[in-house]
Regions:
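Bacterial N-terminal signal peptides
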Residues: 8-18
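Short sequence/structural segments immediately N-terminal
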Residues: 23-450
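Positively charged n-region of N-terminal signal peptides that target proteins for export
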Residues: 1-6
Length: 450
């Protein structure tokens, strides 16, 4: 079945390119051995599409050059195909070159536009945590809103709510999690709500920005297959996946040999031999072995490693039992079951160990809350601050490090730090229970080493 899919894919791709491809001329730069592709805009485009290309070649040449180097530029997919919208679209506007015509465009291109040519990929994406769930945690969660606007946006210090200064911290979150796009009177985005990450919500009701992984305007499959594509969001103390990967044996091999690997193979054909070790995409998305390519990154996941307490995934976050089996199929591409079983056992038992610390922390938290011995501000209360540190920083390092073969992250930066934090939690708990009051001076330094 997989062979049939591959054959049909190759034939359809070949036919599509032969019918509508733009002509590209290869020129060699003397001495530098650099190749440049000069697109001749005289075949496969409507007059309107040509006008867009020629105008933007002058106004935004970097965008056009990037597009020319991508596969869309060589398959007659132009600005016109992706940016033109209906006149009654809430995002419809006209640039100076279009005024007086019936053509309306938008700088915003959502996954629904991509879905016209890539319906399967978009359908899978919309079922993943990269879609609606990612947006909710930033834009629909009361605690996150308080953190972004009242605390980080200095509303608590007198900054006017809703002012540019007040809302600017949101930009860093929406770069990955996505924004709720707001429009001005000309239907152009305002209030720093665009561009946004993979879970951006658009005024026409559509969701998702494929360009987060396939950066516009080259939209490269090779880029999305490299760990750097994931590492721009999955990094830092609260989700250090790229740091874990780089320190793992997989990351070591990518660092040493990655430039020699083939990242351009067609979907369903990208297999071991094109690479010597997996990138993020190989394990979580690629059609390796008996697996089919997927844009639903939940499908091969077992645990909710982001949460305060780790449980098997269920419901809209995926099927953890099925995910475990699917991920093991990916591992079979390079490893024996003996090797993989050890890795999965280390992951699972590290998670069980973390949960022991979290459960005891939750018990102490419950008793302190019942006795009114927790501060009202979680950012300044010593116990609440350490509790967040335990799960969001040290706890995630331990769990994710164990899941991705990052030994130091799992142990020294993870479990060892959990032990130290837990001892401080116990000390604060014991003081408050014994004295029936909150300590006058917090034992925790805000903004300490995380």
């Amino acid at each position: 079945m997989k062979t049939l899919r591959i054959t049909l894919l190759i034939l359809s791709t070949f036919s599509f390119i032969m019918i509508g491809t733009a002509h590209a001329e290869q020129t060699q730069t003397d001495g530098l051995k650099l190749q440049h592709k000069a697109l001749v805009v005289n075949r496969g485009y409507t007059e309107e599409a040509k006008n867009c290309i020629e105008c933007h070649s002058q106004k935004t040449p970097g965008i056009v050059e990037n597009w020319k180097n991508g596969k869309m530029g060589h398959a007659s997919i132009s600005c016109y195909d992706c940016h033109v919208v209906e006149k009654d679209s809430p995002m419809a506007s006209q640039c100076e070159g279009l005024r007086g015509t019936d053509i309306y465009t938008s700088p915003m291109v959502s996954s629904s536009t991509c879905g016209r040519c890539h319906p399967r990929e978009v359908e899978q994406f919309l079922k993943s945590s990269h879609a609606e769930l990612s947006n909710k945690i930033i834009n629909d969660t009361p605690w996150t809103k308080r953190l972004i606007y009242y605390e980080e946006g200095a509303q608590s210090l007198g900054v006017k709510p809703g002012s540019a200064t007040n809302i600017v911290p949101r930009n860093s979150c929406q770069a990955c999690h996505g924004a709720n796009v707001e429009l001005g009177p000309d239907n152009k985005p305002i209030n720093m709500t665009w561009p946004g990450g993979h879970s951006t919500r658009y005024p026409d009701g559509s969701l998702g920005n494929c360009g987060t992984c396939h950066t516009r305007h080259e939209f490269s499959v090779a880029e999305a297959r490299k760990p750097e594509a994931c590492g721009s969001c999955h990094l830092g103390p609260d989700h250090p996946q790229i740091e874990i990967y780089e320190a793992s044996k997989h990351g070591q091999l990518f660092s040493v040999h990655g430039e020699e690997w083939n990242f351009e193979a067609a979907p369903e054909t990208w297999e071991p031999g094109d690479y010597d070790a997996p990138t993020c995409a190989v394990c979580h998305m690629s059609g390796i072995g008996e697996l089919s390519t997927t844009h639903n990154i939940n499908e091969r996941l077992t645990w909710n490693l982001w949460a305060p307490r780790t449980e098997k995934r269920t419901g809209e976050r995926g099927d953890g039992l099925k995910g475990d089996k699917e991920m093991r199929k990916a591992c079979k591409g390079c490893h024996s079951s003996l090797h993989s079983n050890v890795a999965f056992e280390i992951r699972d038992e590290t998670i069980n160990l973390y949960n022991v610390y979290w459960d005891k922390t939750a018990e102490m938290n419950k008793e302190l809350a019942e006795k009114n011995l927790l501060g009202k501000d979680p950012l300044s209360d010593g116990f609440l601050q350490l509790k967040q540190y335990l799960y969001m920083y040290a706890g995630r390092r331990a769990r994710q490090g164990a899941a991705m073969a990052g030994a130091d992250m799992a142990q020294l930066q993870g479990l060892y730090t959990i032990v130290k934090v837990f001892k401080d939690l116990e000390a604060i708990y014991n003081y408050r229970i014994k004295n029936n009051k909150i300590e006058e001076l917090s034992t925790v330094m805000n903004g300490g080493d995380i």
